[in-house]
Amino acid sequence: MTKFCDEFGGEILDGVTSDQILDFLNRITEGTKQQTRHVRYGHLSAFFNFITANIDADFHNPCSTPILRKMFKAKPIPSWEIIEKDVIDEIIFRTDKPRDRLILELMARGGMRIGEVLKLTPADVQDRKLTLKNPKSGKRREHVFIPQKVADRLKAYIRDNNIQPNQRIFPICYETARTMVKKAGEKVGIRLRPHDLRRHAATYASRSGVPIEIVSKVILRHANLSTTQIYLGKVPDTEAMRWIENLYA
């Protein structure tokens, strides 16, 4: 609202037109994601609605036009197909190459992004706790927690390959890793992408009873729960019935 006040502070609000609002919103949201555009529009529209509801019932909200609502509407939430645990397990167990299996496990068991996996060095590994330097969130560092069996395999891989503390554990490019994941999925007849494995880590934890706050803040390391809820996808009827039955059995 500061930018709005700077631009329109000297004007009578009744005189602000929809065209002016459109121009203003386009300028302050240039280069941003659609969700950001929607939020900025929502804040401004709520401000004008407040005036109508509390100050002047005859005031017309300049944001309330079909073209503005269409241009700044929220992006539809994607519906992800959730891959079941037995399928993920089969993919991992059928991957013979130690390097490739570890990459798959770190994503599927630790909820890591492919880019985070490829940046790992031995210096980042403290048994079951992995340190991510300069993560996507913009924080100085974040931490990932992995199962003991995966941690043991990771340490053995580092030792057996004589990887030095500041060398990358997996010195391959993103495209090579993406292709490996795709081929791993093809072995069991599914289309598999790196992020499907991270999404599986969250979904499996959630359906196993892990509190959503832990799924969000620890496994996925999201800033807010709304992003996590997109990851978790839809709960099928059979899953819903199983949980209700267990709850009241």
Q: Model-derived features: where do they sit?
A:
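N-terminal core-binding DNA-recognition domain of tyrosine recombinases/integrases
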Residues: 1-77, 161, 187
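DNA breakage-rejoining catalytic core of tyrosine-based enzymes
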Residues: 72-89, 137-148, 163-168
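Conserved tyrosine-mediated DNA breakage-rejoining catalytic core shared by Y-recombinases
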Residues: 110, 115, 119-156
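Short, polar N-cap/turn motifs at the start of nucleic acid-interacting alpha helices
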Residues: 125-127, 191, 210-230
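Major-groove DNA-contacting interfaces characterized by cationic-aromatic clusters
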Residues: 133, 148-180
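Catalytic-site neighborhood detector that most strongly recognizes the C-terminal catalytic loop/helix
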Residues: 136, 219-245
